[in-house]
Amino acid sequence: MTPTSSPTPSTKRQLTVPTVADLAAEGKAPEILFWVGCAGAFDDRYKRVTRAFARILEHVGTNYAVLGLEESCTGDPAKRAGNEFLFQMQAMQNITTMNGYGIKKIVTACPHCFNTIKNEYPALGGDYEVIHHSTYLQQLINEGKVAVQGGESYKGRRITFHDSCYLGRANNIYEAPRDVLAALDADLVEMKRSKANGLCCGAGGAQMWKEPEPGKKDINIERTEEALATLSGQAAALDNLRGVETERTAPSQHSLQGSIIAVSCPFCMTMMSDGVKNKEQESAVQVFDLAELIASAEGINA
């Protein structure tokens, strides 16, 4: 398995994703709108997450649809960069489209889209129930609709979870992704800077779209070093990181081979993957989204 590949898939089969327009033409409406997001639609790496989550929705029989070409950027990057006018233009376009279809419930795999639609669209007339896919996956597992068995086994593999800023600090969602990972029966290890004290991947606040300011180290490299040190149990490596207090006695060391950095955000996926490449650990450590891991463990082809 290469680090840029998806987890081991089952037999490949065709995936047909319905659009809201197609259902509307038949006089039907989806129970849930799957908001794909820009990264989920255009970024080659995160398209795999989109497929994995769509496979899961199909697998459990969720009545869902996507907007397809009618979906536009939520306006999050524009707003974070200070262009409120552009944000409101993009937001109103989406709100008009969704209200026209009578959309009530939305699920998305992007914390940036989640935060914007949930917390900022209501002021512009867009009131919806918005769920991040980590919470939805948690619900499916708790309800027994996803058994997390029949596919790839993660038992004993070391996994550390990187908290997304917009999922965690902005919306206080910390346990859902961890509950999802716990279902894999893997060896979950927490980074010192986690949950409310987690370190940003470096891409939020529209930083994804600009060159970094001069400094000693890029944030994603710092965060990746912490993840790798946590996975390998190297206290000495943690000593070199800012804001990380290490234990007095070094924990037992582990091989990085087969270890996983789990994420729940397309920005974090890009930044952590680049960090792993920078540290030349691509052959040992992989970066996966929660949906990819669950689809793989369930034996669903993504």
Which positions does each model-derived feature cover?
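A short, acidic, amphipathic alpha-helical segment used as a generic capping/interface helix at domain edges
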Residues: 214-259
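Iron-sulfur-cluster electron-transfer modules
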Residues: 1-71, 75-109, 114-125, 140
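A polyampholytic, Gly/Pro-enriched intrinsically disordered region
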Residues: 85-90, 146-163, 208-219
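Local cysteine-cluster metal-coordination motifs and their immediate loop/turn environment
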Residues: 36-41, 70-81, 107-116, 160-170, ...
